[in-house]
């Protein structure tokens, strides 16, 4: 190199001697600087602005105020309405206490590893679901778009359930509760009980007729239900206001929305234990039926529940974790949140069956009283001989044990005539075996139980306020799974995007507040999420393990966590989880194919539910929900594979860091190029290859040398490579 070259002069003046290769070999200095810089997302051009080290600069990408706030957000997202009204039903249906064993096994094999995977990629790359999968491979960017579509489909109908809860909450401030008794109908001559209510029950009538004013089929829209329209609007306004500033606004609400449901559940459990029959309900719940546990259907339903309970594939988990510090222990978070979710489900199951045990006891006492009166009538009429009734039994004040004794005697003596007597066995187990889930549990069975509580309005207010908070916690994560990826990718303002999303969702959601809206909720719940989310998570697993590389990913985790994660995760991610997810997908497709597509319609004349098949247009909608949700995956792959559009979303130009200002050199993630850093302090930018540090130090000195202008940039590197180039060109 000529002595008078500008590069030599720089070396003499500024003690700069590193070549491009030397610069790329620096490691220690970059590692030190890693801890002093913070990630922001910025789509603007780089600014030649000096920022003093240690100066207070507000990050453009928000961060959690505390670890507790983050954990509560993840818990609020994963613990939702399904924990209260689906897990108890599955537990009862699939062997009682024995169901907990397959659930725990699948939680360890599928749940925690995949939850840990989503947390770690979000925290490492610090983007939403679209950016994360673009980063790993631009051809797989459709995975993130598919997550957003599924999130939006789910948000459309999930917020309707919050609207229903708001309606019941608003109606709970009266004594007696409006669903306590059947309404009376008056005409010119006399007063009588509403026939539809008399044939069903007061709570069933109130749900279908007063709340939903439901039509007889999905084809009869019946117009909008104005009461539910107002409640849906209120629900979306609440979500919009809570999410308009992202985690900066929702983070403050999370403390209440995540913790309040636990307060209510514990209060309900204590209150239920003081009521007659609660122990019967819990005993019935946890009596194991081991023979059922070996059925394949039990394991399929347990795997599906684990999958959806943790919110896998929605993108909310990735979005929340993207606001974490890079060195956060996401493995601890995955295990903690997973087991909190499990114990919440068990707690909710205890509460549900303690309350249903009390309800069954009340109904059983009424049954015994009514049937005892019927037996006394038969005794007076001579249909039954007084001699067969034991002398120590008084049918006027009969106990359950004595009634069952009399019932068995009459059944044996009057064997041929017994069916004509229309006597009921009045066994509490039969009442508890009437499995209910979903809206049937929350808005019919549980509301009926609360009418028998002392101070029933108070408990009703608490219960439906709990449902609102459970729903909002899940909605925050769902909306975050939509907004964060789009903001990161397209650089739109979060406030504007949030308002547009909520406004559009309310307008589309009007189909759910028609008189036939409940049938559309069932349709979306059955078809919009199950298959698409399974496909999304399978592709996530493949992307990390086989496209990016499981070995490099394990190195990244070691770099982030400060310790090597157990090899257990290596084998789960690479072998076990993909096989189990594929098996679950096949089983779900087979089950969906064997189950006739339809819904339970409320028939007013019969005052009962009746299964109806979807009309042709309904089948088209069902198929469209699945296709539209998963369509972004092949579309993005084809577009990127054949370069059909000029797209730079595979670059890292959108990721910048303050404190040392400013990283801005696009890098193709599919190539081996290394990004270039501009600034006085090397930044904490994720490298295109997770397992490699961008800088490597040659001499081991504590600081990384810079050019005279304080930059690492194109000009400085080119000066070292091409010394004869004019300085103005550098």
From Swiss-Prot:
Cell compartments where the protein resides: Membrane
Segments for region (Disordered): 41-60
Biased composition (Acidic residues): 43-59
Catalytic reactions on record: L-leucine(in) + Na(+)(in) = L-leucine(out) + Na(+)(out); L-isoleucine(in) + Na(+)(in) = L-isoleucine(out) + Na(+)(out); L-methionine(in) + Na(+)(in) = L-methionine(out) + Na(+)(out); L-proline(in) + Na(+)(in) = L-proline(out) + Na(+)(out)
Modified residues (Phosphoserine): 25, 55, 687, 699, 701
Extracellular-facing ranges: 163-225, 357-452
A Pfam family it matches: SNF
GO MF annotation, one: branched-chain amino acid:sodium symporter activity
UniProt tissue specificity: Almost exclusively expressed in the brain.
Regions that span the bilayer: 70-90, 98-117, 142-162, 226-244, 253-270, 306-323, 335-356, 453-472, 496-514, 530-550, 571-592, 620-642
Topology in the lipid bilayer: Multi-pass membrane protein
Gene Ontology BP, a term: proline transport
Alphabetically ordered keywords of this record: Amino-acid transport, Glycoprotein, Ion transport, Membrane, Neurotransmitter transport, Phosphoprotein, Sodium, Sodium transport, Symport, Transmembrane, Transmembrane helix, Transport
pH dependence as annotated: Optimum pH is 7.5-8.5. Strongly inhibited at acidic PH.
Job of this protein: Functions as a sodium-dependent neutral amino acid transporter. Exhibits preference for the branched-chain amino acids, particularly leucine, valine and isoleucine and methionine. Can also transport low-affinity substrates such as alanine, phenylalanine, glutamine and pipecolic acid. Mediates the saturable, pH-sensitive and electrogenic cotransport of proline and sodium ions with a stoichiometry of 1:1. May have a role as transporter for neurotransmitter precursors into neurons. In contrast to other members of the neurotransmitter transporter family, does not appear to be chloride-dependent.
UniProt xrefs under PANTHER family: SODIUM-DEPENDENT NEUTRAL AMINO ACID TRANSPORTER B(0)AT2, SODIUM/CHLORIDE DEPENDENT TRANSPORTER
Official protein name in the record: Sodium-dependent neutral amino acid transporter B(0)AT2
Originating organism: Homo sapiens (Human)
UniProt gene name: SLC6A15
